[in-house]
Amino acid sequence: MVNLTIDGQKVSVPQGTTIMQAAATVGIEIPRLCYLKGINEISACKVCVVEIQGQNRVVTACTTPVQEGLVVYTNSPKARSIRRTNVELILSQHDCMCATCVRSGNCSLQTLANDLGIYDIPYERDVVDTPWNQEFPLIRDSKKCIKCMRCVQICDKVQKLHIWDVQNTGARTTVDVAGNVSIEDSDCSLCGQCITHCPVGALKERNDVPKIYDVLADPNKVTVVQVAPAVRTAWAEAFNLPPELATEGRMVATLKKIGFDYVFDTCYAADVTIMEEASELLEHLQKPQDHSWPMFTSCCPGWVSYVNKTHPYFVPNLSTTKSPQQIFGALAKSYFAQKKGLKPKEICSISIMPCVSKKREAALFSMRSSGTHDVDIVLTTREFIRLLRAEHINPAMLDEQPFDNPLGQSTGAGVIFGASGGVMEAALRTAYHVIEGKEAPEDAFTDVRGTEGRKVREFTLGGATLRTCTVSGLGNAGKLLDELKAGKVHYDFVEVMACPGGCVGGGGQPIHDGEERADVLGNKLYAIDSNRPMRQSHNNPDVQELYEDFLEKPLSEKAEQLLHSDHVKEHNYM
């Protein structure tokens, strides 16, 4: 162990520990901007400078290892003065129009400047503005970029897509799309992890909230909104609601208060997804020679985009079942429209998702089974929160309301879609029922849960062994695809979520700088699942009615027309 003193406190830590890590063990949080543990430890911002007794120069706490006998001052006049100067220099190259920034109030730079008492910038302003396609689902504002390199590192080290890179040199150094290509022509999957790991407002999703106001004001439109499973785990954070108030019913009430005509649950569509995908898996198992192996899930649009752009060889392996968002949209403009005597074009189908890639998915050519876009507008969880704030709605004051029918009732299986391993578990619950003729034990498939990069398990269905694999994060997915193509591994059924931890850790979720919360939010979904009276998709009476009255059976001709896609043209927009 190495012994040192930090701000007068004796500290004993293992060799190799940095000063920043050592300080944290005794509750001393050293200010920083660029630091991401294990991902971005490059001291780019120079905000974490500290003074060491006996040394003339300050050092960066995030990269300097501890030494025996060091006496460290994290906030001495010298360290504080240099830290202040460094932040002032960053601000001189940053668009400080905080009032019009989506990260205002949740910006690490803004907080740091306030903490340091910086109210004027003594240096000449030098803010670089480069053009960007404002219609693209992911927006980059070069005026706000502080060159912390977090986006570069999260994309390189975690997702391994290498979309961002350093451009130019010297004073003109900036971050932009790598390879001298546009973002549209890059391999970007729109996972949004660069957004959630940006400490400022340099990266954000396209703002589609104004479209909501337009459609709510249109008397000729019936507004139908669906809410994804993961959204219910995080929407209430911004309003500091305790768990007993942050309920599904209160979430529904807020949407009704805004003025949406019908509020439905994407978990219902997830149940339908399972009916189709589980049937598809069983068909593959019955005729293995007719299909490509393994069969991949296809509910994550970031994953589907990734396969199309980087590993097209595996496109035939994707389940043809659409994502719950798109299945809901197709049913809203066909089944629901028929029940209500409406034409598809009279319905505006809106989704609230934890995901940026859903915006791209909704615009694809292949997602127009009704003759119009099946989903017209997609909001992220963050946009939903901004919409509530703009409407001055206090959710705590609203009485709970149920989801509307017939697209509102769901099972626990639909809920767990939002967590890594959830789609796999939900599909296996139904596949087991079909093969064995009885319900699986409650904990039969819970071992597929978790946020590990790759989790391999074997289950017995109908006397045969099913080898499954759940993958979290595109970096892990790429490694898996390489091994599959080389013949190093073999699986029968593979679930992939583009975002580490699944949709609960999605690129459209609320941002908590420096925190990874997928585990915590995923457990919320599993808690909801365990308390549901129905936990298997095939037991949803509304789904049973859908098949009896409209679709006939899973994989029927009508189901194939409305609920399936070959995914071949997933990169083509409307």
Predicted regions and their residues:
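Short structural boundary motif marking the start of a folded domain
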Residues: 1-4
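Short strand-turn-strand beta-turns centered on an Asx-Gly dipeptide
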Residues: 6-9, 53-54
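A short N-terminal beta-strand-loop micro-motif at the entrance of redox/enzyme domains
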Residues: 9-15
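Residue-level recognition of alpha-helix initiation/capping sites
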Residues: 14, 136, 146, 189, ...
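Iron-sulfur-associated redox domains of electron-transfer enzymes in respiratory
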Residues: 15-75, 79, 206-574
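Fe-S ferredoxin-like electron-transfer domains
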Residues: 46-190, 196, 203-218, 222
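Structural motif corresponding to the C-terminal cap of alpha-helices
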Residues: 159, 198, 336-340
